[in-house]
Amino acid sequence: SLSDKDKAVVKALWAKIGSRADEIGAEALGRMLTVYPQTKTYFSHWSDLSPGSGPVKKHGKTIMGAVGDAVSKIDDLVGALSALSELHAFKLRIDPANFKILAHNVIVVIGMLFPGDFTPEVHMSVDKFFQNLALALSEKYR
């Protein structure tokens, strides 16, 4: 679980990187679709799945908007993400293993874009946050 220190670290990092959330989301989603091509099946209705395409940028922005919302509601991730969990479980039918794959890509991009801020301590707290976020998104699958 997230300690008070983890929560403070995540909030402090988000305060620094939040203004570039759209860029982080687009890059992370583009990477996921490239490195893990099996994830493309969920987006087959998009005309262009290549990194940097309009749909990838748009959904990357949507994803990071939800991440920002989760950061602001870090004390109740299950409650904060309940509607998204329901959407992904019952309507979109996304395999919850993909939440961890996307989270990994977001972490990679944060490390690339903010190497000075992404210390091992920050990495650990951010990783724990995304593990908890993925778990909260998986809540409706149980």
Curated annotation (Swiss-Prot):
The modification N-acetylserine is found at S1. The keyword Transcription regulation does not apply. GO terms for cellular component: blood microparticle; haptoglobin-hemoglobin complex; hemoglobin complex. The keyword Nucleus does not apply. Residues 1-142 form the Globin domain. Heme b binds at H88. InterPro entries: Globin, Globin-like_sf, Globin/Proto, Hemoglobin_a-typ, Hemoglobin_oxygen_transport, Hemoglobin_pi. It comes from the Eukaryota. Pfam families: Globin. One of its GO terms (biological process) is hydrogen peroxide catabolic process. GO terms for molecular function: haptoglobin binding; heme binding; iron ion binding; organic acid binding; oxygen binding; oxygen carrier activity; peroxidase activity. O2 binds at H59. Keywords: Acetylation, Heme, Iron, Metal-binding, Oxygen transport, Transport. Red blood cells. Involved in oxygen transport from gills to the various peripheral tissues. Belongs to the globin family. Heterotetramer of two alpha chains and two beta chains. This is Hemoglobin subunit alpha. It comes from Carassius auratus (Goldfish).
